[in-house]
């Protein structure tokens, strides 16, 4: 999860997030090189006293500053399109979970396990235990297996919401009357936090998402669904 004074992204817990971190580093390197080139050109402009007032055109220079940005855009677009394709790819998910946004809590349905339905509310500060995280803990966590493809079906009962878990690289809008879907495969067990990422009213900041990822064998035993 995120912590104070954090400089980078959260640690990846899914292949998609690993791809996003790699793309972030790739784009950051290109931005750094562009910034260095611009600063170098400005430095030369400010320190060089020679001028030539007879230049009317510069075909070579215009060709360079037209082709070079096009190449840079292609270098950014190609890996971005690849990640977009991967996020939309759904390959025979093992489990399907439905998340429904409400003002201001989440409801979940385990349709593959007897139609289990429960609500997930943020825990008020008075109910927090030592070590719990303020504004991030919930009364009922979403328990899911690792190393198994999970499909999330996401919608809303009232206004626009957004189901977001940064460690998994997930951010899917919850839209009333529409069912969006996304898939992920978690690679590490643990507890991971997210929040609604679409301003949805007065208590928008109090819609945390908590995923508890456990080994598949433990998940299939069943008692994890006891609320």
Curated annotation (Swiss-Prot):
Subcellular location: Mitochondrion inner membrane
Annotated Mg(2+) binding sites: 198
Gene3D superfamilies linked to this entry: 1.10.287.90, Cupredoxins - blue copper proteins
GO terms (BP aspect): ATP synthesis coupled electron transport
Mitochondrial intermembrane topological segments: 1-14, 88-227
Entry keyword set: Copper, Electron transport, Magnesium, Membrane, Metal-binding, Mitochondrion, Mitochondrion inner membrane, Respiratory chain, Translocase, Transmembrane, Transmembrane helix, Transport
Superkingdom of origin organism: Eukaryota
Catalysed reaction equations from the record: 4 Fe(II)-[cytochrome c] + O2 + 8 H(+)(in) = 4 Fe(III)-[cytochrome c] + 2 H2O + 4 H(+)(out)
Primary location: mitochondrion
TM region(s), chain numbering: 15-45, 60-87
Listed InterPro entries: CcO_II, CcO_II-like_C, CcO_II_C, Copper_CuA, Cupredoxin, Cyt_c_oxidase_su2, Cyt_c_oxidase_su2_TM_dom, Cyt_c_oxidase_su2_TM_sf
Cellular compartments per GO CC: mitochondrial inner membrane; mitochondrion; respiratory chain complex IV
GO molecular function: copper ion binding; cytochrome-c oxidase activity
Record-stated family: Belongs to the cytochrome c oxidase subunit 2 family.
Quaternary structure and interacting proteins, as annotated: Component of the cytochrome c oxidase (complex IV, CIV), a multisubunit enzyme composed of 14 subunits. The complex is composed of a catalytic core of 3 subunits MT-CO1, MT-CO2 and MT-CO3, encoded in the mitochondrial DNA, and 11 supernumerary subunits COX4I, COX5A, COX5B, COX6A, COX6B, COX6C, COX7A, COX7B, COX7C, COX8 and NDUFA4, which are encoded in the nuclear genome.
PANTHER family: CYTOCHROME C OXIDASE SUBUNIT 2, CYTOCHROME C OXIDASE, SUBUNIT II
Protein name: Cytochrome c oxidase subunit 2
